[in-house]
Amino acid sequence: MGATAESAAEQSAGTAPAGRLGFRPGQAVQEFGYDDDVDEALRASVEALTGNELADEDAQDVVDAAIYWWREDDGDLVDALVDALTNLADGGVIWLLTPKSGRPGHVEPSEIEDAAPTAGLHATSTISACQDWTGTRLATPRGGRR
């Protein structure tokens, strides 16, 4: 059991960040806002847990979830969220990842709270996603967005 337990523990440690965000094996996840400041360990964790590479923002396939790296100067958040909804399956979620308070590009929570309903979403929770990024889970209201 020793080797199996170690392997499971190592695997769990590698996928723990993605697990905190609620990702599951087999899910397709689209990524938006990639730049050199993203958390590579979180990206790798999502890919390891889901068993799929992250689809880039130009992908056209339907996805179960999206992660969006968003910084203060990235533009109009409402437009960005609407774009992220394009390929999102019914019942899918968007994790909006923003720099933590005190870090360059920090986004005030009130900006997210204002933008989400305009885009047809609501924030359901906010967590520390990784060392430098806060994650806000955005979902469509029950009954869908259409």
For each feature predicted by the language model, list its residue ranges.
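S-adenosyl-L-methionine-dependent methyltransferase catalytic core, i.e., the SAM/SAH-binding region
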Residues: 1-146
